[in-house]
């Protein structure tokens, strides 16, 4: 009996290890924009580095949530991750507006 229980537990645990997580990642930017191209590269790298155990599906152009709804969707746990214009939340915290200061970065890699 003990061997049977151990066997069932081993099979159940093996199924958990092989489980695949799927995340939806909304963006307010259109599919052909620089921002979404970066997100696609990120999703591809996550897929590769996790051995396919985490799949991220992009939803550009407000196809899952409108741009002004995305931040709230993350806050309420409706999606695990998202991309949105951080400076749009500068009224909540002035630091969120740093990315909209012109000429702060001198290059893409800066």
Regions found by a protein language model. Give the residues of each.
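Hydrophobic helical h-region of N-terminal Sec-dependent signal peptides
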Residues: 6-13
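N-terminal signal peptide c-region/cleavage motif recognized by signal peptidases
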Residues: 14-18
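Positively charged n-region of N-terminal signal peptides that target proteins for export
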Residues: 1-4
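Short, glycine-/small- and polar/acidic-enriched structural segments
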Residues: 22-24, 29-110
């Amino acid at each position: 009996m003990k061997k049977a229980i151990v066997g069932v537990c081993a099979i159940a645990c093996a199924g958990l290890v092989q489980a695949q997580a799927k995340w939806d990642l909304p963006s307010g930017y259109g599919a052909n924009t620089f921002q979404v191209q970066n997100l696609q590269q990120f999703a591809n790298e996550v897929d590769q580095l996790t051995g396919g155990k985490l799949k991220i599906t992009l939803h550009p152009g407000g196809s899952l949530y409108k741009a002004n709804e995305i931040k709230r969707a993350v806050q309420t746990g409706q999606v695990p991750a998202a991309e949105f214009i951080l400076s749009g939340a500068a009224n909540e915290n002035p630091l969120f507006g740093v990315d909209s200061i012109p000429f702060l970065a001198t290059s893409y890699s800066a």
